[in-house]
Amino acid sequence: MTAAHVHLLLNHIPILGSIFGLLVLSYGMLRKSDEIKKTSLGVFVITALLTIPVYLTGDGAAQIVSNLPGVSTAIIQQHDQAATITMVAIEILGAVSLLCLCLSWRSRRELRSWMTLAVLILAMISSGLGAWTGSIGGQIRHTEVRAGFTK
C-alpha cells in the first residue's frame, strides 16, 4: 500500500470528524448536557490524532500523482498549503479539547461555558478549513470540479 492509498483512505477523517464533533457539541450545548459536550471533546481529540497520518502521507501521495496526466502541480501546492493550515487548526482544536477534558475531570466540575465556547469557535474554524482543504484536494484528480471546467 502506497502513501497515496493511505492518504485517500484517511483523508476524509479530518473533515468529517470536525463536522461530526461540531454537530455533537452544538447538540450538547442545546441540551445543556455536559456528557454530550465531553463526548464531542473526545471526538475532537481522536480526530486530531487521526489527522496526523493524513498529513504525513500527503507528500508521498503528491509525489505519486504529480506525474499523472491532467494533474496540476499548482493545485497540489495549494492543497499542501491549505493542509498545513488545517492540520495546525485541528491539532489546536484537539489539544484544547484534551485540556478541557482534563480540567473538567480534575476539578470534577462541569465544563465552563468559556471552554465550550472556545472549542465551538475552534471547531467551526477547523471544519471550514477542512472543507476548504478537501475541496482543493478534490480538484487534483477531479477536473470537473475545477474553476472554469467546461464539457
Q: Can you describe what each PLM-predicted range is?
A:
Residues 1-151:
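Polytopic transmembrane helical bundles with strong interfacial aromatic enrichment
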